[in-house]
Amino acid sequence: MSTAFRISDAVPQPKSMEFRRRDLHVGAAIGSHPIDHDEVYYVLSGEGEVVADGVLALISKGKAAYLYKGSVVGVRQMGSEPLSLIIAYPVTPK
């Protein structure tokens, strides 16, 4: 299970970036999925692993993962405390 927080809703419109906090509880994961824009995952606390196109990297507090448009990505919480991330990506124009 995870909890998501939209932290950029108060930004005046139109905005060009979205920022969300995502807390992955112990044992939680965001399964592999394709992305159609670049994304940055910044770790606030906890430990985990991120996979992009089959390449696995460990992430922990203070580290960031830059994920590229067209990649298939996923992230998984590891350890005894939740993995708390800021996820940033561009807003798709409507």
List the predicted regions and their residue ranges:
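Short acidic-glycine-tyrosine-enriched beta hairpin
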Residues: 54-70
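Ligand-binding loop in jelly-roll beta-barrel domains
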Residues: 69-94
